[in-house]
């Protein structure tokens, strides 16, 4: 087992559907030779407070760490809940400190969903918790921004283009969603085509049901049914393998 913590490359791209991770050349070779463990949290928390959501997230994080995951991705707006008509006030960093502490303690990178404010307007966004950094990083979904924690960088771009400028060394694209029925079918079709077209693995974390992982050929590796669980993926020299881990 070889961890990818601390060795993300400079170019990572979040487009409209999610977040793209680009390990550097040496890391890419290492990944193909050894294990890279990732997980999507199929999180369906319907709590009324951010503190309750955080406690629920910590349960998922501990389980992912138990399975030696390097990266855990939560669905859209996981820290506040996706069902509200209007986006709530973004939680302050002090309130989210337990998640950053967990990232440090377990040495795991976390992506969770929450509202962000830009120019007086609230919009859907992401929070990034990294083991090597003492600050929570926030940015809006689908807008231009960049993030460089130490030797890692995450760049957020506008995803309106039909031809996103993907780094040829990119090995994983993640998508944080909260969709059902028709929109879910649309999403999985879009993500599968994306994986095939750009030859990149895709991890989808969806709230409540239907999280999935596709390989670089667009072939489905694993897809979850309903319920709270971890959908995990491990990449080794033979490619991707997936598993479903129910939460106890």
Set out the residue ranges of the language-model regions.
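Extreme N-terminal starter segment of soluble prokaryotic enzymes
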Residues: 34-38
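Short terminal hydrophobic/aromatic SLiMs and anchors at protein ends
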Residues: 1-2, 11-12
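Cys-nucleophile CN-hydrolase/nitrilase-fold catalytic domain and related Cys-dependent amidase chemistry
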Residues: 50-132, 181-200
